[in-house]
Amino acid sequence: MDLIPACDRTMSSSCLVAELVSIAPNTTVGLPSGIPMATRSLILLVCLLLMVWSHSEKKTIPGPSFCLGLGPLMSYLRFIWTGIGTASNYYNNKYGDIVRVWINGEETLILSRASAVHHVLKNRKYTSRFGSKQGLSCIGMNEKGIIFNNNVALWKKIRTYFTKALTGPNLQQTVEVCVTSTQTHLDNLSSLSYVDVLGFLRCTVVDISNRLFLGVPVDEKELLQKIHKYFDTWQTVLIKPDIYFKFSWIHQRHKTAAQELQDAIESLVERKRKEMEQAEKLDNINFTAELIFAQGHGELSAENVRQCVLEMVIAAPDTLSISLFFMLLLLKQNPHVELQLLQEIDTIVGDSQLQNQDLQKLQVLESFINECLRFHPVVDFTMRRALFDDIIDGHRVQKGTNIILNTGRMHRTEFFHKANEFSLENFQKNTPRRYFQPFGSGPRACVGRHIAMVMMKSILVTLLSQYSVCPHEGLTLDCLPQTNNLSQQPVEHHQEADHLSMTFLPRQRGIWESPSPF
């Protein structure tokens, strides 16, 4: 899809100098005798200036050729057609770890070099993201919420509410909520032979999010259907051109899908508001309650409250739950790792319920989770925009340049001893943060990174201490059809529902061999 950069073949200044100088073996001889000495000196001076200029030019960034505008068009079409993640991997594999492409006519850099990625993540010049304003407006994210809010001042203000809810004292209750919710959903399984694992994990995670951050009764399956449609709309409209939104008949279906979830969340927020008004005493001020108070004090609009609750609710079902799904597949593909993990769980947790103090002791589990996030992450890139001119690894970056940080590829190319293998040896030693960025770092790092680790550990321990999870024959990570647009997702079709299911076989503590599903 990319053009051979033949259109870029122009004579460089150094070539011009070489041609001028090579007219004769001695530059003071060989010129026509009629040319005065002053003219000869001027020619030599120009040649020297051209040589200096050619060596002081900024580094050129590799990438597809511009070629009369066809290069930007073709690279943009690749992103639209194959997805952001897939296209980013394609260009890094083809051109290297720093690549220049175009998205919707805007210059975009794709970075998978650790030093460049670290520079962008830590630098406040890149606290904004890029995306279609009309697309973000369609899903309610334009200058609202936290995920793609590019109003930096408002984003900083809103982030404080998320930080309070996702860190500190609120983390203490997370383990108990996760264990209770996971156990409840395990007890409610109608069959252990054909478990819809993705559905089980999504329902569990939505329930946990509701208990921690909202606190009102919800229909989990109905809400999950709306979340799925919203996510599909999100990745469909994020980088679409403005002309796409000129024709309502084209994007109306996606706009309706986004509105359905927004209306559902608004209804839940209103229910929470009424409960607060009717309560004699408010013992538990959770995330949604804090936002409602902020709205009452004029600090946040009703639309922002709705969007913040929406983003808190959707953050886990299509990221954390799918991460857990990938982890279960990798666990069964690496039985020696499963053995280590079960031995650790039985030794540290035993017959008791998981406690907060157990988490730090589960070192094998932590290495396993980190290796899964490195080897096959759900979200393997992040999007930024340069707010000021800058230099990244010697390359000049102009204000307004789009940046894609391809951390998934970075994790496979630098530092790790067995970068292309799934191995816990990759985390035997402490890994410098700049080489391992599953949640990002710096001012715009994932605010939920700590609670995400607690949730994953709690769910895995509760599940694996009771059941051996057995994917059906042929279900492996390599054979699993996947897409990679905003995130890596398994392709789900109704006719393939059984193929994605697994069998849960009861296990006894202290017995570490997987029982046969037959």
UniProtKB/Swiss-Prot annotation:
Gene3D superfamilies: Cytochrome P450
Alphabetic keyword roster: Heme, Iron, Lipid metabolism, Membrane, Metal-binding, Monooxygenase, Oxidoreductase
The protein's required cofactors: heme
GO CC terms: endoplasmic reticulum; membrane
PROSITE patterns (alphabetical): CYTOCHROME_P450
Major localisation: membrane
Binding site for heme: 446
Signal peptide: none
GO molecular function: aromatase activity; heme binding; iron ion binding
Membrane topology per record: Peripheral membrane protein
Catalytic activity: testosterone + 3 reduced [NADPH--hemoprotein reductase] + 3 O2 = 17beta-estradiol + formate + 3 oxidized [NADPH--hemoprotein reductase] + 4 H2O + 4 H(+); androst-4-ene-3,17-dione + 3 reduced [NADPH--hemoprotein reductase] + 3 O2 = estrone + formate + 3 oxidized [NADPH--hemoprotein reductase] + 4 H2O + 4 H(+)
EC number(s) per entry: 1.14.14.14
Cross-referenced Pfam families: p450 (PF00067)
Domain of life of the organism encoding this protein: Eukaryota
Protein's cellular compartments: Membrane
Catalytic class of the enzyme: oxidoreductase
InterPro entries noted in UniProt: Cyt_P450 (IPR001128), Cyt_P450_CS (IPR017972), Cyt_P450_E_grp-I (IPR002401), Cyt_P450_sf (IPR036396), Cytochrome_P450_Monoox (IPR050196)
BP GO annotations: female gonad development; lipid metabolic process; response to estradiol
Family to which the UniProt record says this protein belongs: Belongs to the cytochrome P450 family.
Function: Catalyzes the formation of aromatic C18 estrogens from C19 androgens.
Protein's recorded name: Aromatase
Gene: cyp19a1
